[in-house]
């Protein structure tokens, strides 16, 4: 009896082993079918309805479980567990990922719907152009992502993730801006022929990858300050902040460094990061300037210009630009650059005069019956001088507000590709300027520990050697003026000469070009990106 029971047990074990092998093969086939169906569902549709779920389950399990003949096991037998081999379709992780994906898709739909409506939620067609709506979207995204970057530290994970995700959505429009280009096509018989095919527009093909690289470099620079422990920040109302308080940036937290200053390794690291960010800033400025130069000047801006460059610049500035002995650096020393309003006003005047002179060189001033009093060669010379001054202003004040000409170009631009390049490069330029400013704050706090005697009078973060060098240049320029020939003096004119001497020698303490970065924030309570974020469309700051 016992021997018969043992034989029966061995028979059941052999049948169970055979059934288990069949189950494993079936499970592997089910997993492959389920994976392919899930991939098709994720790529082909947004929502999973009940009918779709039923269809997916039907396709993933072509055979019914009840169709398998299960052997009857005796009492005490072991039932095979099929759940050990089959994956769980509705796990908590997959459901959470699906919810996040659906939320991101809804957010993307909302964003692109606003872009298509042109910021006009009523749908009445009174919104802005697609180019301006896209430019505003990139500007507002950067303001929300980088507006709170008040410390030299990595970005928050959620803000960095949102920035990378949404900027990818917005600049993905550039992938569909194409142009025709000739390509060689080889036929089956071996002959080749030239056909026209589409490719991404050349300016986008070159600049979009470059801007992405600059973006990654800036974020990587911030990530490198994650584990630093040599400097920290204190709140602006803390008693410890009075020692290193910079009145020009009173709303920012104060930087604290060790009593003996930073180590040599940290100081070199900060200098290297500053140089890297400076290169990013220059590259972003170059791309932005190139894109703005390619935009057409609106007719409304041309109609608002005065008749000649002298009326735009004013008599004083016009005489300073049109003299024989012209020096752009000396011109900026002579000008009053004590506030952002004055800097922006000078920038607007210079740009307006450049546009006027360029138009007159093209039109050759045929309206005047007596001809122009200024030759074309002189106009070209004046235009080059004005462009040099404008370039120095942009380099000396990278965080300055946009000029009237730039705002007009952005408002009336209809090229979506140029709008993407301009806004993307502009926000990267602002971010690079912010990061460089935060690095300079740390270096300034370290400099105070090395030179405590210069704590009170030093409101700028530039060394005295640079100021002395500029003073020596000023004195050498004065000596050159004094040793000029009689013809040079006659060209200046007696009245103008007296005016220049009074303005040049009367105020020795006017801000130099090396001191310009501090005056931009005298009366500002928010950053440049914060101001841009609240703007529906680019508008002039000063009326």
Swiss-Prot record:
Region Disordered: start-end pairs: 61-89
Cross-referenced InterPro entries: PRONE_dom, RopGEF
Chief location of this protein within or outside the cell: cytoplasm
GO molecular function, one term: guanyl-nucleotide exchange factor activity
Places the protein is found: Cytoplasm
Boundaries of every PRONE domain copy: 95-456
Tissues where the protein occurs: Highly expressed in elongating regions of roots and pollen grains. Expressed in flowers, and at lower levels in leaves and stems.
Record's keyword terms, sorted: Cytoplasm, Guanine-nucleotide releasing factor
GO cellular component, one term: cytoplasm
UniProt GO BP: root development; root hair cell development
Additional free-text comment from the UniProt record: Plants overexpressing ROPGEF11 show retarded root elongation and irregular root hair formation.
Free-text function comment from the UniProt entry: Guanine-nucleotide exchange factor (GEF) that acts as an activator of Rop (Rho of plants) GTPases by promoting the exchange of GDP for GTP. Functions as a light-signaling switch that functions in root growth and development through the activation of Rop in a phytochrome-dependent manner. May act as a negative regulator of phytochrome-mediated primary root development.
UniProt remark on domains: The PRONE (plant-specific Rop nucleotide exchanger) domain is responsible for the GEF activity.
Complex and partners: Interacts with ARAC4/ROP2, ARAC3/ROP, ARAC9/ROP8, PHYA and PHYB.
Name of the protein in question: Rop guanine nucleotide exchange factor 11
Organism per entry: Arabidopsis thaliana (Mouse-ear cress)
